[in-house]
């Protein structure tokens, strides 16, 4: 004969209530930390661009750039109109590169009418300092342009050294604007 013992005893109900309340409390507490997700993919997101930022650039900002399709590399190069692209002077041009196959964007320091390595000079605290930039990979170029960006934010006057000639770099107002807008557009594309 089956026993008539109650299955849900008061002690069991207390235990169920405690574990139920604790689990709900844990869910609520962990929901506050939901915004941070670990990136376990092993993928480097340094140069990653989102579709929204790419479309913003293409629809609103790309009109200020000269576009060059590089179908062999699957990339599109953008050079700002303010750099005076038709000029024959020695200078540096910031090239914004969109690689839509990898959803990545790069910023390249392109020498015009000079060769690598690029040598720059500037004055800081009354002393002339030199920068030497070598042609390298995308990480090297990002490091170089961020170093240049920091100097330009400090409003340091840069000079390009070519065979002991000191050529003012980005001295015209249109070139300064081109550098500024290229930096702004690039860092908006990669959202860094």
Each language-model region and where it sits:
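Short, aromatic- and glycine-rich surface loops/edge beta-strands on solvent-exposed regions
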Residues: 152-163
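A generic "folded-domain core" signal
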Residues: 2-143, 147, 161-192
């Amino acid at each position: 004969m089956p026993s008539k013992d109650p299955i849900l005893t008061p002690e069991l109900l207390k235990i169920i209530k405690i574990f139920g309340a604790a689990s709900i409390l844990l869910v609520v507490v962990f929901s506050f930390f939901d915004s941070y997700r670990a990136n376990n993919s092993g993928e480097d997101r340094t140069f990653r661009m989102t579709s929204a930022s790419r479309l913003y650039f293409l629809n609103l900002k790309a009109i200020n750039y000269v576009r060059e399709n590089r179908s062999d590399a699957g990339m599109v190069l953008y050079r700002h109109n303010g750099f005076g692209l038709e000029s024959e002077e020695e200078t540096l041009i910031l090239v914004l590169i969109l690689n839509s196959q990898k959803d990545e964007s790069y910023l390249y320091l392109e020498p015009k009418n000079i060769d690598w390595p690029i040598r720059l000079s500037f004055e800081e605290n009354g002393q002339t300092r030199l920068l030497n930039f070598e042609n390298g990979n995308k990480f090297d170029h990002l490091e170089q342009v961020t170093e240049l960006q920091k100097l330009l934010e400090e409003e340091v006057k840069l000079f390009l050294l070519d065979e002991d000639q000191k050529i003012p770099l980005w001295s015209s107002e249109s070139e300064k604007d081109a550098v500024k807008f290229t930096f702004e557009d690039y860092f908006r594309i990669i959202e860094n």
